[in-house]
Structures are given as C-alpha cells and as structure tokens.
C-alpha cells in the first residue's frame, strides 16, 4: 500500500458511567450531576461541529456504556432526550456502541455463569434497555471491560458470546492495563492496529485493540502532533497500512468538551476538547473519524501477544484501587458467604440429593430475567467495581449502602435456595439409622460454577473443623467424655470458652466419583489421658511435625520455616508491621519481642499449636496488637495460621480530593502500608525470574513471571503489585521450590488478597530476586514506569494532576482484622494437584449436617452464615435502601434536592512547581 492510500482511523469513545464510588446518588454535582452535564455538552458539541460543515462530515463516536443497570436507567429517567439523541445518531450510522457490562461488573470477580449472564443482559434484557434493543445494528462486537480488567478465561467466554475483540489500554502513564506486561513490546503496526490476543490457558484467542487515553495525548504534545508522528511511521514503513487510534476515556472528564482557561493561554493544545480534534482531522486529509464496526474488518492482524498477569487500569496496572481497602475485604467476605450457600445448594443438586426442589432452586439462583431478584442478578450488581473503588481510602457513604444492599439481596436469595436444598436433603438423612449416636454428614463443595474447571474433584485429604452443638459440648464437659469416630478418622477435640471444637482430617479414600459425600458417626467415650509419641510437637521455641519445622529465636521471632529440611522462610517470617509517617520516607513499626504460648503440645498425636502475640505502638498510647495461632497436624505438610490484628485508631483531617469528590470522611495520610502477617519466603530467583501461580473464579489455574524488567528495566523493583485474581490461593515459586498461600473465604476473603513487593537483588543480601507477600494487607510506594516513544511527560504530569495515587492503609485505622491462612511448601514449579485440592476445600469448607440421636433434630454448625442478612441490616442501616429498587432509592435521596442551592465540593487548587509549569508551557508550544 503506498502512502497516499494509507489512512489513520481515529475512533473516539467516551466511557459512560453514572454510578460512582467518590460521589453518591444526588442529581447534583455530589452525585451524577456532572455526568448529566458533560454528556449533554458532548452531544451539543457534536451538533455544533456537524453544523460547521467540516470536510470530514459528522464526527463519529463509539459510545462505551459501562453498564445498563445504573447509567442507562438514569439517562432514561433524568435525561431521556440525551439517550434519544444517542439512539438517533446510531440509527443514522454516525455512531456505534461497544460492549461493556450490564452491571458495571469487575468481570474477573465473576464466575463463568455470572459473566455470561451479565453479557447476555447487557445486550438484551427485560428492562428493555439492552444495547441490541436500544441500538440495533450498531453494537460493535468489541468489549471494553469495566476498568479494562482482564484475567485468563475471559477470552474463551468472549468467544462463546460472539465478542470478537477486547479494547485494552496500552498507555504511557498510570491509567493503563497492558504496557508494562506485554513482552516483546508492541511494535508500531501493533500499537496502532490489531493484534492476535492469545489465552495462556488454552489455544483460544481474540483481537486486541490497543486503546489510549487523554494522558497519551499529553505525551505526544497534542493530537495533531500525534497524528503526524503516526504518519511518519507510515511513511517509513514502520506501519505498513492503515493505522487505528482508539481514544477511550471517562465521559465525565472536561477534556471532551474543553477546559476553561484564561484568555491568554487558550491557545494551549490538549484543552480544546472535541473541537480541537475536529480541527486537527479537518487539516489532515489522511485522518478520518471512524467507528470500529466499520474499520476493524478492513485492518490486518499484526502478530500476536499474551498477557499473563491479571490486569486492570488501577494503580500498578492491577486491582489495588478495588481490593486493598479494609472494607474491600470485609465486603467481599460477605459475598463469599452468600456464594458458599449458593454452592452448597448446587452441590446437593449435582449429587442427586435434591430432585424435587431443583427447579425452584435454579430459579432463585439463576433466573434468566433481570427483573427477578435472583442470586446471580444481585451478585453481578454487588460485583460492580464502583462498590469497591475507585475512591481510596474511603467510599462515599451512599455507595456503601447500595453495595451492601446488593450483597444482602444476593445472600437472601442464596439462603432461600439453601433452605430448599437442605429441607429435601435432610429428610433423607433423618431416615438413616444412627444406633444411638450422633450422625454427621459431610459434603465437600464440589459444584462451584458452570464450567468443567469449576467442578471440583477430591484429590486430597481435607481439614474439617467445626463447633459442636451446645448440648453436646455440655454433655462432654459434664461427664468428662471424649469423642471417637468409628471410621477411625484422625481427629482432635478441643475446648475453648465452654464450647467444644472437633477437628478432623478426612481421608481422600472416603470419597469416590459416584459419591462425593460421606456419613460418620460420633461416639461418646471416656477421655483418654495417654500421650501419643510421634514427631508432632510444640515447645517454647519450636513447632514441628514429620514435614515441617518452625523455630523461634530468643525474642520470640519466627526465623526458620523448614519443609523436609529445606528452608522456606526468612527472619521475621509472618511479621505484623505498619509503615507510618512521611510519604517518601515512612517509619516501619513492628514488635521488638513476641510472646509465645504453647496451646497444644502435640501429645494427643493429632495437632500442635503455638500462639504468637505481637504488640507495638505507632504513636504513644496507640498500640497495634496481633495474635497468630500457628497449627500443624500429624502427617500433613501444611502450616495453618489464624491471624487476629487490632489496629489502633489514628484519625486525621485529610480527605480525598478531586474535581468532583463528595467523600467527606477524614483520615490520617501518615498511614502508608499495613502488613498484618507479612510472608517473607526464602525462595530466591537466582537462576530465573520468580513465578506466581493462581486460580481465578473461572477455575482457571495460570501463572505469570515477575519479569517486568524485560519490558522496562526501570520496573525491576516494584513497590506494589496486585496482579493476581485469586479464588482461594496463589503460589510463589522459583521453579525448583514453591510456597502456596491460601485463605478460608468464610473467615476473610478478597478477590486479590496478596499484594506483592518485588526486589531484583533481594531485600537484604544480594542473592537474587525476592518477593514479600502481604495477605489481606496493603503495600504502596512508587508507581510503575511506562516506556514511550513520546516525551514521557504523561507519567510525570499524570502523578501531578491525579489524586488517585492514595494509599489504602488509612482504611485499616481502628479496625479488627481476622483471617485464616494455609501455607503449603512444595517442590517444583506448578503446585501439585494434591495441594491445590486441599487449598480449594480450605477456601470453601465442606458443608456439615449433624443429627441428634435423642430428638432426631437436624443441626447445621455453619448456621451463622445464614444469619448474615440480619447482621448487615444492623451494621449498615440498610432498611431503607433494601425496600426500594434503585430508581426509588435515587428519588428518595433527591426528595429535597434543590438545583438552585450550591452543593459542597471538595476541590483543591493546583499547586504546581516552576518545573512543572515550564514543562506544560514548552509542551504546549511544541504541540501547536
């Protein structure tokens, strides 16, 4: 193709989202008022530009609706003329819409069935506001996910749903998803064209459409200069055909309509909005405004690439902005409890223990109508990214209310399905003969989703741990009785605060493919006082079994964690610490000495435990107190850690500020990092880069290497990386040995629970690449670096002008955090299937039914999960919001709204140094 034939296709894509984390549900600027204002101005500007008869004809737009449920509903309710104008422009084929989601969901936070239903409703729904219903024939089959989130398995689902490609940021500043992770770097043909985007877990692929934001315009001085740079690449043959430049950014940004400036500097490029784009295209005959639906079929595919980490356009190109606040863990744990109830129901159905109630259970969980309050509908609404961020470290109070209302409804539906399943399944249990003994029925949760990857098998033993009914605990205590399980399953009975807890290791051999549940009988026996001699032991300075040995120094610090004689830990392994103080040079606070207490010495032959207490002050009179219970079981190669941290409450007078924030909750910015139980593995990348394995909610097990310096050497050391979506566990390995870290979702859960800190040459001795792992904690620090063919100023000015680089650590102030971990050392690269299976069933523990021999009563030890709804109502005062649909709630919020009354806004004037002002001035001149 000769140069005269080559075009630059310029696609403009405003990202429309009226549902925000740092604003509420007001019709004014404290809510979605700015969205209403800017959306109207964009359409007005398009009309004016069209009336001016530029050479290119109508300016084409690729509208990017983040969701139907909030944004389109609100447009239809409060801005129907605007929605009608978009519909009309699409009818005239000036515009198109690209694919987002029905519920503004973080798509990697969903399972397969949920994502497929979300996409289905996005396109067509009974509310009548699906993209295909509103914009027939103008739905481009290309997705721009909310926050450009991506994880493995999405490509396969997109292929099934007819989605042909995905728009992902490949930007030069910290509003990006792919740039630091794609190796080799995309060449010019790929950066301004199409790339085959491969899955790392199958042979599936889709189109990658590299996408850019307004910050990238800054990096090239102006849109006109950027066009000319691309043209030079076409002239030199670096781009051998047409080029595509897709510009996608939040619709509520003033950059679309133009920034008001003093008259003396109105000449500045990058401030003129759509009109500036129109003038540039009008002056350059080789540039055309384009819709993706029209131009992508004309473009060739240039090479291929794979993105191995899980990514989003948050801080550090990952999930920091939605996963690292204290409330993110708290909220997600609520959701996982609802999920547990749902999965119990599905497991009982798939095990053919429920037949009569199958249809009503399925209707409650997965009704295909978006008008029905099903579990899946409310799970999708709950999993909106807005309910978890972007606002940091606090969310808007109204956003907390709506978020909790959706998890409340999801739990309500899951509980109803659970009760129907138990009602039928328990009748079969009641019919079984007990011979005067307690009967226990155990159901490992094997049905966790729609796909084969979400159907689990039992490939290992697993841990069963539950409190006995009060009447049984009383009888055991009163009559000095113990428990014998007739099947001779390893177990221990432990008493704490008057209640008895039974802990068992259930052998894999008890299950088979035809029957993935078992019955056990509990016999009361005389207490045995004989001590069992084996290699299970807890002393004042060590904890060990046949596989693992943990040692403590004279200060009570854990300094060695050995598996089969090989060291897996470093000094201060499992340390609690807080980084507090100045942003650039904070102090790290931690305990100088830990108290150790032997809880179980191992003499019962089943388990041994040590409690480690750490206490330190951040400020005088402001202590942090951490308790960690470390447990080993006989003949099991795993360490279990129960963590309970009480953080002191240090509040300040700072608050989150941007041009539209209405979050007034104050905090102390000196909170920088929080490490509740920091893992310091002795796993060194001295021969190759370290590797992370993880399992996501689609059931996909995948890995990524910590090789970001191959893309950009400046990213050899990374202060925080949150690039692993995790349904239960992740591992770190140097391909010779590895360590799996998993969590119990019913205690604490987070979809990205382990931020990482990476050092190329180690944290103390220069032995090789090292990593710190921070379960349920928070790291912070310098952002990633972004290679560029531009001036590099997008990254510099982006940090100056954006207030989103806030630490989430202040959200932990005054909070109590409890979580349970499993640490499983292993040899090799990929974790063995046996360890994966154990971690899977630790994450979502088995469901248990007990039958009392006296009154034949059925008891459920996990019944507290069923009461979550009442807990949510008490804590979050949601009686009002759960009694309304969303539009009723919005009208309730706005019942006293006065559009003429000024609304408070948290704004902060620009405080620019001389260097920054000179950069902006010189770049402005160069952009002319």
Identify what each model region corresponds to:
Residues 2-141, 148-207, 227-241, 275, ...:
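Catalytic alpha-helical scaffold of carbohydrate-active enzymes acting on polysaccharides/glycoconjugates
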Residues 14, 65, 99, 209-211, ...:
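Pocket-edge structural micro-motifs
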Residues 17-19, 67-71, 103-105, 148-151, ...:
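Short, solvent-exposed loop/turn segments at secondary-structure junctions
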Residues 21-31, 100-111, 139-140, 212-216, ...:
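Glycine- and acidic
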Residues 23-34, 75-77, 256-269, 653-658:
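Short, flexible/disordered intra-domain loops and linkers
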Residues 79-80, 209-212, 696-697:
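Short, solvent-exposed helix-helix connector turns and helix-capping sites enriched
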Residues 139-144, 150-332, 452, 457, ...:
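Aromatic- and carboxylate-enriched substrate-binding clefts and catalytic-loop regions
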Residues 263-265, 272-928:
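Terminal accessory/anchoring regions of large secretory-pathway or extracellular enzymes
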């Amino acid at each position: 193709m000769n140069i005269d034939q080559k075009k630059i296709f310029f696609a403009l894509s405003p990202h429309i989202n009226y549902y925000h984390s740092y604003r509420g549900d007001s019709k004014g600027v404290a809510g979605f008022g700015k969205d209403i204002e800017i959306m109207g101005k964009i359409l007005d500007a398009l009309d004016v530009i069209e009336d001016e008869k530029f050479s290119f004809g109508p300016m084409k737009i690729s509208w990017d609706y983040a969701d139907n449920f909030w944004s389109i509903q609100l447009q239809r309710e409060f801005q129907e003329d605007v929605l009608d104008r978009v519909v009309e422009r699409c009818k005239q084929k000036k515009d198109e819409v690209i694919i987002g989601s029905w519920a503004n969901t973080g798509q990697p936070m969903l399972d397969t069935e949920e994502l497929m239903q979300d996409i289905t409703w996005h396109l067509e729904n009974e509310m009548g506001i699906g993209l295909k219903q509103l914009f027939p024939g103008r739905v481009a089959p290309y997705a721009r996910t909310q926050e450009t989130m991506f994880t493995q398995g999405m490509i396969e689902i997109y292929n099934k749903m007819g989605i042909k490609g995905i728009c992902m940021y490949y930007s030069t500043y910290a509003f990006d998803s792919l740039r630091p992770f794609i190796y080799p770097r995309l060449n010019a043909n790929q950066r301004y064209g199409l790339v085959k985007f491969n899955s790392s877990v199958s042979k599936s692929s889709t189109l990658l459409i590299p996408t850019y934001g307004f910050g990238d315009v800054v990096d090239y001085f102006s849109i006109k200069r950027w066009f000319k740079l691309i043209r030079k690449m076409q002239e030199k043959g670096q781009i051998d055909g047409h080029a595509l430049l897709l510009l996608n950014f939040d619709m509520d940004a003033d950059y679309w309509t133009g920034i008001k400036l003093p008259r003396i500097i109105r000449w500045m490029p990058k401030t003129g909005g759509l009109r500036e784009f129109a003038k540039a295209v009008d002056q350059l005959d080789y540039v055309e405004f384009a819709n993706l639906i029209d131009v992508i079929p004309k473009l060739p595919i240039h090479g291929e690439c794979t993105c191995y980490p899980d990514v989003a356009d948050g801080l550090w190109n990952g999930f920091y902005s939605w996963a690292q606040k204290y409330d993110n863990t708290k909220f997600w744990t609520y959701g996982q409890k609802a999920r547990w109830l749902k999965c119990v129901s599905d497991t009982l159905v798939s095990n053919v223990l429920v037949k009569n109630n199958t249809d009503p259970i399925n209707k409650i969980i997965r009704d295909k109508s978006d008008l029905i309050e099903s579990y899946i509908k409310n799970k999708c609404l709950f999993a909106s990214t807005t309910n978890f961020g972007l606002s940091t470290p606090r969310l808007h109070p109204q956003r907390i209310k709506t978020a909790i209302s959706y998890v409340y409804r999801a739990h309500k539906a899951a509980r109803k399905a659970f009760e129907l399943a138990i009602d039928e399944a328990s009748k079969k249990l009641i019919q079984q003969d007990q011979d005067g003994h307690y009967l226990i029925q155990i159901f490992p949760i094997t049905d966790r989703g729609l796909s084969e990857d979400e159907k689990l098998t039992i490939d290992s033993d697993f841990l069963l741990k539950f409190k006995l009914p009060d009447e049984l605990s009383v009888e055991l205590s009163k009559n000095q009785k113990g428990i014998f399980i007739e099947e001779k399953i390893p177990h221990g009975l432990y008493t704490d605060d008057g209640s008895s807890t039974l802990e068992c290791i259930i052998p894999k051999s008890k299950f088979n493919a035809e029957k993935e549940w078992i019955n056990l009988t509990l016999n009361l026996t005389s207490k045995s006082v004989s001590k069992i001699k084996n290699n299970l032991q807890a002393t004042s300075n060590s904890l060990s079994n046949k596989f693992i040995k943990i040692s403590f120094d004279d200060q009570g610090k854990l300094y060695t964690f050995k598996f089969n004689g090989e060291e897996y830990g470093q000094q201060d392994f499992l340390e609690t610490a807080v980084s507090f103080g100045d942003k650039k040079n904070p102090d790290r606070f931690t305990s100088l000495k830990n108290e150790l207490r032997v809880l179980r010495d191992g003499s019962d032959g089943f388990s041994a435990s040590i409690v480690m207490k750490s206490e330190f002050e951040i400020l005088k009179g402001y202590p942090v107190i951490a308790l960690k219970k470390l447990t080993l079981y006989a003949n099991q190669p795993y360490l279990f850690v129960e963590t309970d941290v009480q953080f002191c409450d240090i509040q300040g007078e700072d608050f989150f500020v941007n041009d539209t924030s209405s979050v007034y909750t104050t905090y102390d910015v000196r909170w920088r990092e929080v490490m509740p139980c920091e893992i310091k593995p002795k796993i060194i990348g001295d021969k190759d880069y370290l590797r992370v394995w993880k399992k996501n909610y689609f059931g996909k097990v995948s890995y990524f290497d910590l090789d970001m310096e191959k893309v950009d050497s400046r990213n050899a050391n990374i202060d925080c990386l949150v690039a692993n979506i995790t349904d239960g566990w992740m591992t770190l390995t140097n391909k010779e040995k590895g360590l799996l870290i998993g969590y119990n979702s019913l205690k604490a859960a987070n979809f990205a629970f382990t931020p990482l800190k990476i050092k190329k040459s180690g944290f103390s001795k220069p032995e090789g690449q090292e990593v710190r792992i921070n379960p349920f904690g928070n790291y912070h620090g310098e952002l990633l670096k972004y290679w560029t063919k531009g001036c590099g100023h997008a990254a510099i000015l982006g940090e100056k002008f954006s207030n989103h680089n806030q630490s989430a650590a202040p959200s932990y102030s005054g909070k109590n955090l409890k979580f349970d971990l499993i640490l499983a050392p292993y040899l090799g690269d990929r974790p063995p299937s046996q360890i994966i299976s154990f971690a899977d069933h630790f994450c979502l523990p088995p469901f248990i039914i007990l039958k009392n021999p006296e009154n034949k009563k059925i008891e459920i030890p996990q019944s507290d999960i069923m009461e979550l709804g009442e807990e949510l109502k008490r804590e979050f005062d949601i009686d009002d919001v759960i009694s309304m649909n969303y539009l009723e709630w919005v009208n309730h919020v706005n019942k006293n709204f006065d559009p003429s009354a000024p609304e408070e806004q948290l704004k902060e004037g620009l405080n620019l140094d001389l260097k920054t002002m000179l950069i902006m001035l010189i770049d402005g001149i160069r952009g002319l």
